Swiss-Prot record:
This is 2-C-methyl-D-erythritol 2,4-cyclodiphosphate synthase. Homotrimer. The gene is ispF. It catalyses: 4-CDP-2-C-methyl-D-erythritol 2-phosphate = 2-C-methyl-D-erythritol 2,4-cyclic diphosphate + CMP. Keywords: Isoprene biosynthesis, Lyase, Metal-binding. Pfam families: YgbB. GO terms for molecular function: 2-C-methyl-D-erythritol 2,4-cyclodiphosphate synthase activity; metal ion binding. The record marks 38, 134 as: Transition state stabilizer. It comes from Salinispora tropica (strain ATCC BAA-916 / DSM 44818 / JCM 13857 / NBRC 105044 / CNB-440).
Length: 161
């Protein structure tokens, strides 16, 4: 039997919103402005959700957990990621891995990278790597207006039992 992998890219971005708690890569960042959104606006977790759902042909974050579904209002990115992974598995796929990059000036991901990877990997039930980059002052994240998350996910059809 030939295993055919499926790969997809997911993107998410949110503007900073003063007064909201900051959740990025499954972690709370005290003292940082949070991000505006229907849920906790965790760009890393949301990008990973988009990548996983797309790889399994299950749509995207908005189609699965959007504003038309009030039960997901205020949900944590980790909860959305865990539910996305469950849906991917229910659709007959095994998750190989996910890689997420957070683009922006703050918070500084590096010092908490291992913690973020542990939290997101537990939510997915597969390895999740986390990295970060700045844009040297260019664009939305470079102007410190918010953050962008980009993720890639690898899934493959689960072997028949």
């Amino acid at each position: 039997m030939v295993i055919v992998p499926r790969v997809a890219i997911g993107v998410d971005m949110h503007a900073f919103e003063s007064g909201r708690p900051c959740w990025v890569a499954g972690l709370h960042w005290p003292g940082q402005d949070g991000l505006a959104g229907h849920s906790d606006a965790d760009v890393a977790a949301h990008a990973a959700c988009n990548a996983l759902l797309s790889a399994a042909e299950l749509g995207d974050l908005g189609a699965n957990f959007g504003v038309g579904q009030p039960e997901w209002s205020g949900a944590s990115g980790v909860a959305l990621l865990s539910e996305s992974a469950r849906r991917v598995r229910t659709a007959g796929y095994t998750i190989g891995n996910v890689s997420v990059q957070v683009i922006g000036n703050r918070p500084k991901i590096g010092p908490r990278r291992a913690e973020a990877q542990q939290v997101l990997s537990a939510a997915v039930g597969a390895p999740v790597s986390v990295s970060a980059a700045t844009t040297d002052g260019l664009g939305f994240p470079g102007r410190d207006e918010g953050l962008t998350g980009i993720a890639v996910a690898l899934v493959y059809a689960a072997p028949a039992a």
